[in-house]
UniProtKB/Swiss-Prot annotation:
Matching SUPFAM superfamilies: Zn-binding ribosomal proteins
Lineage of source species: Archaea, Methanobacteriati, Methanobacteriota, Stenosarchaea group, Methanomicrobia
Transmembrane segments: none
Cofactor annotation: Zn(2+)
Sites where the protein binds Zn(2+): 17, 20, 36, 39
Full protein name: Small ribosomal subunit protein eS27
Gene label: rps27e
InterPro entries reported for this sequence: Ribosomal_eS27 (IPR000592), Ribosomal_eS27_Zn-bd_dom_sf (IPR023407), Ribosomal_zn-bd (IPR011332)
MF-aspect GO terms: structural constituent of ribosome; zinc ion binding
């Protein structure tokens, strides 16, 4: 029972870049800086746990 509750703490997120409106998939607990592939803006920065997102979340994949 504990394993089921702890299994889904992270997910993939589809985010939208605020500068160029490019949609990109990022991991919710990214350990490196994620940049937009089109314009190069930082979309997510690592914090030691969940990433600090600087983009709009469109959808979540669990």
């Amino acid at each position: 029972m504990v394993r089921e509750a702890r299994a889904n703490r992270s997910s993939f997120l589809k985010v939208k870049c605020p500068d160029c409106d490019n949609e990109q998939t990022v991991f919710s607990k990214a350990s490196t800086t994620v940049k937009c592939v089109v314009c190069g803006r930082d979309l997510a920065t690592p914090t030691g746990g969940k990433a600090n997102l600087k983009a709009e979340i469109i959808s979540e994949f669990k």
